């Protein structure tokens, strides 16, 4: 239930109700953030997106207690004259819009660059010109490769955190060669970050930049052939979920050796709410939002997901639960990757007092329970062969 009474920020100051223009509100992160804002705060949401499937439960029926606090506007920010007017109506703009699926980075590099840089330019411009605060969602991909990845594999410094832990104010952004179009996303995201930062420095734009480190949970991406294109390749959680639902081996790109950290969407949304409601502490900062305690290789993630799914579904694992594939075979020509992505949490902990809470096992159990409940029957119907007459 929304509770506007006696809400105070981290410094004990009363929190005033805001009108928030959320661009990309219909996506994975946007849907969870809308839920949080509507059920636990008095804030109003102008929800902008091309699709609203993931927030329909918040828009219908009109009798829900927050019906007067959310408006959905079907907008493609590429070419819609309504965007500036909606920005002017708001106190805060949150830009979540992006192409953020690795399979697209080197197969659709132009769309990736336009979506993440060119299409975001008007949002930054309107915020700066109209003195509106902006929370811009970037990505941990802006860090690119770690310094340690350039050392020999047996070099002792590869285990030194100084060579792989990623810090917002210190770590360099290291990308692959131009032919490796996988970095089109990271470059576009880094450039829009630099523009936002420059608008703050030169024109006084109030901004916060968020760098998510693998946020996962219910409603992430899609299951190919069920609520997304059959040929689509979603991110790793949905890819592995799709394999588990179809009782297929989980595909490990280049052996699944890359190391990643994963944070539960509910924990991450708590961090975003702190940014929204503590502008004096968040303005001008870039925040890593991840969980360094949940570090695994992609192979270990696959093994854990197989174990968790067997528990929540009651189905035993298949005989060969994983299969190795090359990155060229899976993603196409021009793919490249980083070896590790481990966030340093010093700044967000100091400014906002935020720390993630949910273990990898618990977040996978919650997420895969949702995946099984939501998709198992549909996948079964889609994969069952018609009975011969």
From Swiss-Prot:
Keywords attached to this entry: Cell wall biogenesis/degradation, Cytoplasm, Lyase, NAD
Binding site for UDP-alpha-D-glucuronate: 105, 139, 141, 182, 185, 214, 251, 253, 260, 331, 335, 337, 341
Cellular component terms per the entry's GO annotation: cytoplasm; cytosol; peroxisome
Cofactor(s) it depends on: NAD(+)
Known catalytic reactions: UDP-alpha-D-glucuronate + H(+) = UDP-alpha-D-xylose + CO2; UDP-alpha-D-glucuronate + H(+) = UDP-alpha-D-apiose + CO2
Molecular function GO terms recorded: identical protein binding; NAD binding; protein heterodimerization activity; protein homodimerization activity; UDP-D-apiose synthase activity; UDP-glucuronate decarboxylase activity
Keyword Cytoplasm: yes
Protein family membership: Belongs to the NAD(P)-dependent epimerase/dehydratase family.
Name by which UniProt lists this protein: UDP-D-apiose/UDP-D-xylose synthase 1
């Amino acid at each position: 239930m929304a509770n506007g009474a006696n809400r105070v920020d981290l410094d004990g100051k009363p929190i005033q109700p805001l009108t928030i223009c959320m661009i990309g509100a219909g996506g994975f992160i946007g849907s969870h953030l809308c839920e949080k804002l509507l059920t636990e705060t008095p804030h109003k949401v102008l929800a902008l997106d091309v699709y609203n499937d993931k927030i329909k439960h918040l828009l219908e029926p009109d009798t829900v207690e927050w019906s007067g606090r959310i408006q959905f506007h079907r907008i493609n920010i590429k070419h819609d004259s309504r965007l500036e007017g909606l920005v002017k109506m708001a106190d805060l703009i949150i830009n979540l819009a992006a192409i953020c699926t690795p399979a697209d980075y080197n197969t659709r590099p132009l769309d990736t660059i336009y979506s993440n840089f060119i299409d975001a330019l008007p949002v930054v411009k309107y915020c700066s010109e109209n003195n509106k605060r902006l929370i811009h969602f970037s990505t941990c991909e802006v860090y690119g490769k770690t310094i340690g990845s350039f050392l020999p594999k047996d070099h002792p410094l590869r285990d030194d955190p100084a060579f792989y832990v990623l810090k917002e104010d210190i770590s360099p952004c290291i990308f692959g060669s131009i032919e490796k179009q996988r970095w089109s996303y990271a470059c576009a995201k880094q450039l829009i970050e630099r523009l936002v930062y420059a608008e703050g420095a030169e024109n006084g734009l109030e901004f916060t930049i968020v760098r998510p480190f693998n946020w996962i949970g219910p409603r992430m991406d899609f299951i190919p052939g069920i609520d997304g294109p059959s040929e689509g390749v979603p991110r790793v959680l949905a890819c592995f979920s799709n394999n588990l639902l179809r009782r297929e081996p989980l595909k490990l790109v280049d052996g699944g050796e890359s190391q990643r950290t994963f944070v539960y969407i509910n924990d991450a949304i708590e961090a975003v709410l702190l940014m929204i409601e503590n502008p004096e502490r968040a303005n001008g900062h870039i925040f890593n939002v991840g969980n360094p305690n949940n570090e695994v290789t992609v192979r270990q993630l696959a093994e854990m997901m197989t174990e968790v799914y067997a528990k929540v579904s009651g189905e035993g694992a298949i005989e060969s639960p994983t299969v190795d594939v090359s990155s060229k075979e899976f993603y196409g020509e021009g793919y490249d990757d980083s070896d590790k992505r481990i966030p340093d949490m010093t700044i967000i902990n100091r400014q906002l007092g935020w720390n993630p809470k949910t273990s990898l096992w618990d977040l996978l159990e919650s997420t895969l329970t949702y995946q099984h409940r939501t998709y198992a029957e549909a996948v079964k119907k889609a994969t069952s062969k018609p009975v011969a007459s």
